[in-house]
């Protein structure tokens, strides 16, 4: 046929059988990738430390999505919370992966069958004997079936009526677990951080989809609308389908990057805004103050801070810190976190507490500055020692740790104090193992960053595709070169290929 590579899809025009075939093959590829990628991730995933080396630090991509839907067990005898599992069954990581691979194989065979047996009677119009698809009816069928699936997910799976529920956690990502969720039908259901909205919105959208599907199955579009929206053209279907996909991609890119109940911190890592706003730092400070109010010592108050919460308050877990084009997991960058060293409290020689100014997200280097409680600079690590006025040595800064591995250990050596001041720029201080993975010390992004980048990029591409194909189908006659002064009223290209010379033209 001599088609260029970017027009090979022309072969499925006016060929419903092979159009179905290529769609089934696409489903086979998607399901096969999902199953295969899951098995690969399971082969390299280390579940031994869910607190300091969670899935998102290891660069897992599909495992977090499976976990948020209620899968937590592995055939290898572990589950995502670190417990031992005896008989995980089919509802496990490997079970679902194998099911996807088997489904992929069946779709592959079905695609071949439909490619070979493409000219089926069901695709022929009884009136004309030509191949065609009743696209409004196909739309109604798809809408109805997707509505049933949407309603079923919200009403049964999420609520736990017939299913495990979904991953639900507290606002600070500490107590997450899989549990049933009651639908939230009030205004709180529109809060993106309320899990109940997931159930209620799927139920509502499912009911709407079912009703809309039944409507489109039972009511035919008026001729003026059918012609005006080019409902008989398969490229119209392509354009509107691309619109649905790019719209969904933009939505999920937003919920992933800004955070929501569908993207828990425990599964995808913190958002950049939680670092920018000092979200976890404020919660840690609140807990310490509460401990001191209960007459606990500083050491006791800081020792009660969960290591998980302290780890979130570390810039290395900020997805915007890694750069989009540094390949690999977070562990390949700054290393595998081994333990929390504790919270450093800096003081000058008069005993006044000093606070290290934290590094903003988009800085690779940042001056080490220590300020007092009023925000006034009291000490620093100078760039030029000859002009220094506030150096650690001159001010006599010391550091003492509370909580963690260095609890109640203090240092007065300026070199050591400066080392910990530099590390305090990055949030809470952790011991990091760079030897095991030969980590290079350069921050990486989390799966949250990769997902957002990928979906936002493809959403823009698909938006362009929607405009392109929408314009082609709406202005098909113009692009095909049909004169506006045709004598006969014809719908060009309804059954003929583009540029059919037999179409009658008569200049008035």
Curated annotation (Swiss-Prot):
Transmembrane segments: 21-36, 101-115, 140-156, 203-218, 237-252, 457-472
Primary location group: plastid
InterPro entries recorded: PS_antenna-like (IPR000932), PS_II_antenna-like_sf (IPR036001), PSII_PsbB (IPR017486)
Pfam families reported for this sequence: PSII
Topology versus the membrane: Multi-pass membrane protein
An example molecular function term from Gene Ontology annotations: chlorophyll binding
Single biological process term from Gene Ontology: photosynthetic electron transport in photosystem II
Keywords (A to Z) from UniProt: Chlorophyll, Chloroplast, Chromophore, Membrane, Photosynthesis, Photosystem II, Plastid, Thylakoid, Transmembrane, Transmembrane helix
Record note on cofactor: Binds multiple chlorophylls. PSII binds additional chlorophylls, carotenoids and specific lipids.
GO cellular component assignments: chloroplast thylakoid membrane; photosystem II
Cellular localization per UniProt: Plastid, Chloroplast thylakoid membrane
Recorded superkingdom: Eukaryota
Task performed by this protein: One of the components of the core complex of photosystem II (PSII). It binds chlorophyll and helps catalyze the primary light-induced photochemical processes of PSII. PSII is a light-driven water:plastoquinone oxidoreductase, using light energy to abstract electrons from H(2)O, generating O(2) and a proton gradient subsequently used for ATP formation.
Subunit structure: PSII is composed of 1 copy each of membrane proteins PsbA, PsbB, PsbC, PsbD, PsbE, PsbF, PsbH, PsbI, PsbJ, PsbK, PsbL, PsbM, PsbT, PsbX, PsbY, PsbZ, Psb30/Ycf12, at least 3 peripheral proteins of the oxygen-evolving complex and a large number of cofactors. It forms dimeric complexes.
Protein name: Photosystem II CP47 reaction center protein
Source organism per UniProt: Pinus thunbergii (Japanese black pine)
Name of the encoding gene: psbB
């Amino acid at each position: 046929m001599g088609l260029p590579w970017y027009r090979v899809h022309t072969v499925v025009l006016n060929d419903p059988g092979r159009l179905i075939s290529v769609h089934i093959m696409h489903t086979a590829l998607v399901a096969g990738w999902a199953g295969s990628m899951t098995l690969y991730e399971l082969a390299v995933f280390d579940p031994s430390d869910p607190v300091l080396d969670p899935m998102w630090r290891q660069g897992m991509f599909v495992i977090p999505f499976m976990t948020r839907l209620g899968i937590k067990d592995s055939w290898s005898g572990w589950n995502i919370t670190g417990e031992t599992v005896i008989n995980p069954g089919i509802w496990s990581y490997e079970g679902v992966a194998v099911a996807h691979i088997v489904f992929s194989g069946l779709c592959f065979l079905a695609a071949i069958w439909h490619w070979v047996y493409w000219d089926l009677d069901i695709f022929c119009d009884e009136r004309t004997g030509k191949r065609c698809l009743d696209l409004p009816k196909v739309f109604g069928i798809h809408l109805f079936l997707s509505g049933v699936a949407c309603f079923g997910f919200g009403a049964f799976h999420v609520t736990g009526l017939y299913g495990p529920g979904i991953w639900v956690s507290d606002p600070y990502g500490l107590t997450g677990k899989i549990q049933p969720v009651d639908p939230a039908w009030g205004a709180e259901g529109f809060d993106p951080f309320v899990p109940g909205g997931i159930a209620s919105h799927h139920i509502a959208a499912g009911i709407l989809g079912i009703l809309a599907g039944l409507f489109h199955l039972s009511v035919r579009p008026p001729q003026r609308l059918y012609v005006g929206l080019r409902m008989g053209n398969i490229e119209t279907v392509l354009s509107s389908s691309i619109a649905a996909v790019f719209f969904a991609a933009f939505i999920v890119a937003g919920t992933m990057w800004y955070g929501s109940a569908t993207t828990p911190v425990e599964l995808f890592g913190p958002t950049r805004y939680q670092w920018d706003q000092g979200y976890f730092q404020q919660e840690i400070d609140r807990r310490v103050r509460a401990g001191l109010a209960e007459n606990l010592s500083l050491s006791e108050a800081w020792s009660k801070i969960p290591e998980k919460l302290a780890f979130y308050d570390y810039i290395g877990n900020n997805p915007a810190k890694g750069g989009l084009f540094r390949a690999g997991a977070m562990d390949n960058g700054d290393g595998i976190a081994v333990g929390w060293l504790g919270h450093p409290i800096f003081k000058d020689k008069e005993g006044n507490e000093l606070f290290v100014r934290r590094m903003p997200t988009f800085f690779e280097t940042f001056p080490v500055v220590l300020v007092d409680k009023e925000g006034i600079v009291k000490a620093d690590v100078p760039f030029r020692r000859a002009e220094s006025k506030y150096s650690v040595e001159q001010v006599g800064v010391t550091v003492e740790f509370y909580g963690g591995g260095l609890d109640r250990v203090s240092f007065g050596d300026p070199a050591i104090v400066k080392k910990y001041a530099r590390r305090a720029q990055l949030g809470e201080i952790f011991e990091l193992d760079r030897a095991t993975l030969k980590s290079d010390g350069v921050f990486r992004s989390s799966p949250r960053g990769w997902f957002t980048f990928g979906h936002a990029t493809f959403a823009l591409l698909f938006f362009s595709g929607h405009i392109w194909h929408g314009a082609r189908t709406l202005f098909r006659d113009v692009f095909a070169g049909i004169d506006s002064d045709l004598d006969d009223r014809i719908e060009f290209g309804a059954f003929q290929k583009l540029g059919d010379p037999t179409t009658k033209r008569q200049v008035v």
